[in-house]
Swiss-Prot record:
Signal peptide stretch: none
Gene Ontology terms describing biological process: positive regulation of single-species biofilm formation
Protein role: Stimulates the phosphotransfer from phospho-DegS to DegU. Affects protease and levansucrose production.
InterPro entries: DegQ
Source organism per UniProt: Bacillus licheniformis (strain ATCC 14580 / DSM 13 / JCM 2505 / CCUG 7422 / NBRC 12200 / NCIMB 9375 / NCTC 10341 / NRRL NRS-1264 / Gibson 46)
Biological classification of the source: Bacteria, Bacillati, Bacillota, Bacilli, Bacillales
Record Pfam families: DegQ
Stated name of the protein: Degradation enzyme regulation protein DegQ
Family: Belongs to the DegQ family.
Length: 46
């Protein structure tokens, strides 16, 4: 493999890692929001 190809792969992997991290953070926030809504609904109907 050429050095340039290795660098391109490193950049691609770095971007993928960041995108995965951002996606995980977003999913955690969504999950937290759903949990809060569920608690509110439970309290409201109880």
């Amino acid at each position: 493999m050429e050095k340039q190809q290795i660098e391109e792969l490193k950049q691609l992997l770095w971007r993928l890692e960041n995108e995965i991290r951002e996606t995980k953070d977003s999913l955690r926030k969504i999950n937290k929001s759903i949990d809060q809504y569920d608690k509110y609904t439970y309290l409201k109907t109880s």
